Regions:
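Positively charged n-region of N-terminal signal peptides that target proteins for export
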Residues: 1-4
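Bacterial N-terminal signal peptides
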Residues: 6-14
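Short glycine/proline- and aromatic-enriched beta-strand/turn motifs that initiate or cap beta-hairpins
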Residues: 19-82, 167, 242-253
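Outer-envelope beta-barrel architecture signal
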Residues: 33-41, 74, 86-88, 123-125, ...
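Gram-negative (and chloroplast) outer-membrane scaffold detector with strong preference
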Residues: 45-47, 81-174, 241-251
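Extracellular/periplasm-exposed beta-strand and loop segments of Gram-negative cell-envelope proteins
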Residues: 50-71, 96-127, 163-192, 220-238
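Internal, hydrophobic beta-strand segments that form the core of beta-sheet-rich folds
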Residues: 214-217
C-alpha cells in the first residue's frame, strides 16, 4: 500500500497538468464595432505632380537649368473625418510640401567663366474642407449594437480651402539691361483660394484601421507680388497620388 500511494499522487499531478495544458485558447477579439464609427483620423504621404502652367515656370525653365518636373515632389498630410450620415463624412485636411532646387543660367557665365548659380524654393501649405461620399455601404448592423465594417469601400469627394505659398529665389542673377551679375533675393508669399476633387478606396487591414489610396486634383494660383513684375499669378495646381492609414474614432459604448 505504501508503494502505491506515491505512484497514485504522481498520476493525479500529471492529470492535472495535462488538463491545464489542454485548456481552450483565448478567444480572438471580435471583428465588429459597437455601433457606427463617429469619424476617422489619418495620416498620408503623396506625390505631387504640378501643372506648372503659368509664365513664371516658362521663364525659369527657359533661363535657368530647371525643368518643370523639378517642381514635383513628396507631400505629407493629415485628415480628420467626421461622420455625417452612413455614407457621408465631413473632411478637414492639411497638406505640406517643399521643393528646393539649385540651378545656373543656361546661356551666361560670370567674368571668370564660372556658372552663375542660384537656388529656387517653392513651399505650399493647404488647409482644406470637403465632403467624402462612400460609393457602397461602409458596413452593416448586426443586431442592436454590433456594426461590421466592409473590407473595401470606394469613395469620391470634393471641397475647397486656402493655400499658403512661398516662392523664393536667392543667389546670383543677370541684369538683362547691361548683363552685369548681382546677388539678390526674390520672394513672394501669401494666401490663395483652392478647390479640389478626389477619389479612392479604403481597405480595412485592422479592426479599427484602414489603408487609404486616393488621387486628388487641386486648383490654386497666387499673385507673385512686386519682386516679379508683369508675371501672371503662379500656377499652384496639380495632381496628388496618396497612400495613408486612417484610424476609426468612436465613442466608448
Amino acid at each position: 500500500m505504501r508503494l502505491w500511494l506515491p505512484v497514485l499522487l504522481v498520476l493525479i499531478a500529471a492529470s492535472a497538468a495535462n488538463a491545464q495544458d489542454s485548456s481552450p485558447p483565448p478567444r480572438p477579439s471580435p471583428d465588429f464595432l459597437f455601433g457606427r464609427p463617429d469619424g476617422t483620423l489619418g495620416i498620408r504621404t503623396s506625390w505631387l505632380t504640378g501643372r506648372a502652367g503659368s509664365d513664371w515656370y516658362d521663364f525659369v525653365t527657359d533661363q535657368l537649368t530647371l525643368e518643370k518636373k523639378n517642381f514635383n515632389g513628396p507631400t505629407v498630410g493629415t485628415d480628420l473625418g467626421i461622420t455625417l450620415t452612413p455614407r457621408v463624412d465631413l473632411m478637414i485636411g492639411f497638406d505640406y510640401n517643399q521643393r528646393t532646387r539649385a540651378s545656373e543660367y543656361r546661356d551666361f557665365v560670370d567674368n571668370n567663366r564660372l556658372p552663375i548659380e542660384q537656388t529656387t524654393l517653392l513651399r505650399e501649405a493647404n488647409i482644406s474642407g470637403g465632403v467624402k461620399v462612400a460609393l457602397t455601404e461602409r458596413g452593416r448592423e448586426v443586431g442592436r449594437l454590433a456594426w461590421v465594417p466592409r473590407t473595401v469601400v470606394p469613395f469620391v469627394g470634393a471641397g475647397g480651402g486656402a493655400m499658403w505659398f512661398q516662392v523664393r529665389q536667392f543667389g546670383d542673377f543677370v541684369d538683362y539691361v547691361d548683363l552685369s551679375v548681382f546677388t539678390d533675393v526674390f520672394e513672394s508669399k501669401g494666401w490663395a483660394p483652392s478647390a479640389h476633387v478626389f477619389g479612392g478606396v479604403d481597405v480595412r487591414v485592422l479592426r479599427r484601421a484602414y489603408v487609404t489610396f486616393d488621387a486628388r486634383y487641386i486648383w490654386a494660383s497666387g499673385n507673385l507680388g512686386p519682386d516679379w513684375v508683369d508675371f501672371d499669378p503662379i500656377d499652384l495646381s496639380g495632381l496628388r497620388i496618396s497612400a495613408g492609414i486612417n484610424f476609426i474614432i468612436s465613442e466608448v459604448r
